[in-house]
Amino acid sequence: MRYHPHTPEDVRAMLDVIGAESLDDLFRSIPERLRLARPLDLPPAADEITLFAELRALAARDDTAHPPFVGAGCYPHHVPPAVDQLLLRGEFFTAYTPYQPEVSQGTLQALFEWQTFVCLLTGMDVSNASMYDGATAMAEAALMATRVTGRSKIVVSAAVHPEYRKVLATYLRSTGDEIVTVPFGADGRTDLRALEAAVDGGTAAVIVGYPSFLGVVDALPQAAAIAKKAGALTVAVTAEAVALGLLQAPGALGADVAVGTFQSFGNPMSFGGPAPGFFAIREQFVRQMPGRVCGATVDKHGRRGFVLTLSTREQHIRREKATSNICTNSGLAALAATIHLALLGKQGLAELARLNFARARMLKDALGRAGIAPLFSAPPFNELAFDVGDAEAVVARLAKRGIAAGAPLARWYPELPRAKGALLSVATELHTPELIELFAQSVKG
């Protein structure tokens, strides 16, 4: 409280209004033992130039010399400078949905374009105006499935992102719904026999990754067929959305719901977030979809306009009728993804996806020449798991060379046969052939 713009007279007037004798009165609810009895131990004041130099020096200690090979749900991709420049426009630079939305036609049109891109890439009929992130989108999909089917069991593949599954468990902890996790096989894909045994007449949804957390392209059509036979919904979860520029759309393979994140478009890694979640469905479920939808309409003068519709969140309708309590969504992050996709276009996205696929193959071949084999035989997109002997040691060793090597899988899958050596690494358009070769030789030691 030692530095603020108010004069002593201002402070005295405010204290008189609230009936306090001093500023200390405002903190009486905090026990004395928890209060700091001395000023903070801060360095001397510095001018702006000196301060920024110090901050840059501190930031440089965390910098790596090369693009990271770490993916595991958050991916290093090039963000065109035009994305950040357009985000800075005053009309857009807020994460908030306007409380008088029809006044903000530009924002609404951007959200409408987001929904269009989501539907095009997922093969679904309807998308909402974004979710918090991929994990909460998946959890909301499970809740929607229980409402649609009237059932209470969620069957999820162990190859789905482990942290997504933790969020799912948190959401369902108080609902009484059951979560059954089915294993993946030696090829990295969901074990279809185990899936078929787990799915029954009480199953509301089957959730599989597309691609999975392990980087492989999972058996989505077969999983969807098993779910459909039991009357359950199929939820496809995508964390690496660039894959949708190459793979068949989830909707074309039998998925009823497609969720995930578009972090790979227009959004830097930023220590894991923020990242826009997407949620797309078949039209028959539109009344049960969480969040809100931006729709196009025509006003009384025949002019095209945009409105928020089907806003079944508890801020807009009675709580007991709401499909979710989602508040401020990831609107600005969704706009970044929308701008990036618009800049890429259909052909550009396909080229980007093919390049990522090719770089993953290059990574596999380079590590193969170094005598390091992939853990799983199923085809990957741009991320692979390898047995490097001691993953934690490799990560620590390469970090000293300015290379972020990947994510040790033992953190999430200690039961893996070769868990100690399991390292999950990604290769994207940022990883040049020379860098991939350097990485392979560095891992080899």
From Swiss-Prot:
InterPro entries xref list: GcvPA, GDC-P_N, GDC_P, PyrdxlP-dep_Trfase, PyrdxlP-dep_Trfase_major, PyrdxlP-dep_Trfase_small
Keywords, sorted A to Z: Oxidoreductase
One Gene Ontology biological process: nucleoside metabolic process
Reaction(s) catalysed (UniProt annotation): N(6)-[(R)-lipoyl]-L-lysyl-[glycine-cleavage complex H protein] + glycine + H(+) = N(6)-[(R)-S(8)-aminomethyldihydrolipoyl]-L-lysyl-[glycine-cleavage complex H protein] + CO2
UniProt-listed Pfam families: GDC-P (PF02347)
Keyword flag Oxidoreductase: yes
Gene Ontology molecular function terms on file: glycine dehydrogenase (decarboxylating) activity
PANTHER family (UniProt xref): GLYCINE CLEAVAGE SYSTEM P-PROTEIN, GLYCINE DEHYDROGENASE (DECARBOXYLATING)
HAMAP family, alphabetized: GcvPA
Entry's family note: Belongs to the GcvP family. N-terminal subunit subfamily.
UniProt protein name: Probable glycine dehydrogenase (decarboxylating) subunit 1
